[in-house]
């Protein structure tokens, strides 16, 4: 990013470690900063056990705070405002997977319960979406996803029981509409 753009949006916001980079990118995009995908490595970030990316709970809390801060802006364009439910849903699912991946299954459950309020489909379809999303996130990170390990965990079983209580019986039906 050019220095002028960083200064224009106020740089990194110290309220959001370790997700201040996500906040910065959102601010730049909202102000119209043009970007291009470079097909070469320009910066190398080494992930290790003590890096920010391996500290599950602080990363999760910070990313959710960034999302809340972004959508709490009163002057968001209507097109961006229309994406809020979808963005929140996807972000909460990613956070849940990330917490599962970093050894915080209780946190995973809490974030999937929050995602429940933003789901665009029935309860059963949401469950399928969550498993498919976890599989895709793991694949994109180059890690193995053990579906049986996830779905047989006490946290997942508790989540399913919670979901069944939250779901209307008619909502549990999956239709095959053409």
Regions found by a protein language model. Give the residues of each.
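C-terminal subregions of glycosyltransferases and related glycan-biosynthesis enzymes
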Residues: 47-178
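Conserved nucleotide-sugar donor-binding catalytic segment
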Residues: 1-66
